[in-house]
From Swiss-Prot:
This is ATP-dependent protease ATPase subunit HslU. Keywords: ATP-binding, Chaperone, Cytoplasm, Nucleotide-binding, Stress response. ATPase subunit of a proteasome-like degradation complex; this subunit has chaperone activity. The binding of ATP and its subsequent hydrolysis by HslU are essential for unfolding of protein substrates subsequently hydrolyzed by HslV. HslU recognizes the N-terminal part of its protein substrates and unfolds these before they are guided to HslV for hydrolysis. One of its GO terms (biological process) is protein unfolding. Its main location: cytoplasm. A double ring-shaped homohexamer of HslV is capped on each side by a ring-shaped HslU homohexamer. The assembly of the HslU/HslV complex is dependent on binding of ATP. ATP binds at residues 22, 64-69, 259, 326, 398. It comes from Natranaerobius thermophilus (strain ATCC BAA-1301 / DSM 18059 / JW/NM-WN-LF).
Length: 448
């Protein structure tokens, strides 16, 4: 189920986001308020509820400062369906490229998967029990006695013995033959978007008409348990109920993140002719979806009136005012994200629960190599990251990944031969590995 936003105040949402994302408090606050407003809307009377539309958000800031991560983490927090779409992939209707309605179909597909996983979790105990009964039957058939009389006499005893051994984990490496169903072969070109737009689910239709193919596969009991539990869970859940719940969740809680949003705005002060006409065409195609319309999908009709849209872009060559007025009005909340400083980089390296340094240390620990970063080493890394971003292209926190990969390349290569060793990385080590590359502009441009 969705985490009740009644339990999460805007302040609590920001606090949870702080565990993973450094800084950008204004963006976090705006997102937290938008999520809380969804809860407030659900408490309104039905007539007024339909009138309250979500306030879509426009995030403005360079790459790598946390635009996508804030939205993704928030969606994960409340278990809302979330998709990230690059709007540059869309073209005007009638041209080669993705139709803008495909974003809604992708959101519903994501919602279906989310709800299915939750339903599987709800029936997991029962499904596992039924799967283990099937495994016992398979083990009995694999080891059945050649004597029919003996089989009938000892069947219960042998079944009890196998059950005890199975629960003790003694049969995990035994092999059983499992029947797997395969979907009938279908040509996706014959079942394209034009049929989906009419609300026709050809995959489901052909699945009912054509006989399902099956194959028998030999696998260990451990592998079979996963496969059979999934099969049993599928039998226990109601697909129609899943579809209905998923559509409702997509409609009321779905988040569509429109990346590269600045790329469909006309360039400020530049005359690019036909290109600007094409960009405006994409904006006008997106507009009805953002304003609220009904899209036919293979799972049913989906209303977009209360889906939250987040437009995000750097807006270097254009500005929000270059979007068509109607679309500007649909993104009333504007949030500017700050470029990251050396202090931000230092905090990113050390504070989050999934901090980068902890990730690299954990990876090398699998080779039994213990790595320690001194305080001055972390400060030096933060300084270098800021310097390279200022002197080449500002890619925000993504720069840390390239710098750390370069720093630890030699250590990662020789780690299997260094079992049991402890390595201390200090500022001198950082300078030895990176100083020449950082100060040489051509090298830093291509390597970092």
């Amino acid at each position: 189920m969705i985490i009740s936003t009644e339990e999460l105040t805007p302040q609590e949402i920001v606090e949870r986001l702080d565990k993973y994302i450094i800084g950008q408090n204004k963006a976090k606050r705006s997102m937290a308020i938008a999520i809380r407003n969804r809860y407030r809307r659900q408490k309104l009377e039905e007539e007024l509820k339909e009138e309250v539309i979500p306030k879509n958000i426009l995030m403005i800031g360079p790459t790598g400062v946390g635009k996508t991560e804030i939205a993704r983490r928030l969606a994960k927090l409340i278990k809302a369906p979330f998709i990230k779409i690059e709007v540059t992939k869309f073209t005007e209707v009638g041209y080669v490229g993705r139709n803008v309605e495909s974003m809604v179909k992708d959101l519903v597909a994501e919602s279906i998967q989310l709800v299915e996983e939750e339903k599987h979790e709800e029936v997991s105990k029962q499904a596992r029990k039924q799967a283990e009964n099937r495994i016992i039957d398979l083990l009995l058939s694999e080891k059945k006695s050649s004597s029919k009389g003996e089989q009938e006499t000892d069947l219960r005893t042998r079944r009890r013995e196998i059950k005890e051994q199975l629960f003790k984990g003694l049969l995990e490496d035994e092999y059983v033959t499992v029947k797997l169903e395969k979907e009938p072969a279908q040509d996706d070109n014959l079942m394209g978007e034009q049929f989906e737009e009419m609300g026709v689910n050809f995959k489901e239709l052909f699945g009912k008409i054509l006989p399902k193919e099956s194959e028998h596969k030999k696998m260990t009991v451990k592998e079979a348990r996963k496969v059979l539990t999934r099969q049993e869970a599928d039998k226990l859940i109601n697909k129609d109920q899943v579809n209905q719940e998923a559509i409702e969740r997509a409609e009321n809680y779905g988040i569509i993140f429109l990346d590269e949003f600045d790329k469909i705005a006309a360039s400020s002060g530049k005359q690019s002719g036909g290109q600007d006409v094409s960009r405006e065409g994409v904006q006008r195609d997106i507009l009805p979806i953002v304003e609220g319309s009904t899209v036919n999908t293979r799972y049913g009709r989906v209303k977009t009136d209360h889906i939250m849209f987040i437009g995000a872009g750097a807006f270097h060559d254009s500005k929000p005012a270059d979007l068509i007025p109607e679309l500007q009005g649909r993104f009333p909340i504007r949030v500017e994200l700050d470029s990251l400083t050396k202090d931000d980089f230092y905090r990113i390296l050390t504070e989050p629960s999934n901090a980068l340094l902890e990730q690299y240390k954990a990876l090398l620990r699998t080779e039994e190599v213990k790595v320690n970063f001194t305080e001055d080493a972390i400060e030096e890394l933060a300084n270098m990251c800021e310097y390279v971003n200022e002197n080449t292209e500002d890619i925000g926190a993504r720069r840390l990944h390239t710098i750390l990969e370069t720093l630890l390349e030699e250590l990662s290569f020789y780690a299997p031969e260094m079992k049991g060793q402890e390595v201390e990385i200090n500022s001198n080590y950082v300078k030895d590995q990176l100083q020449d590359i950082v100060t040489e502009k051509d090298s830093s441009r291509f390597i970092l």
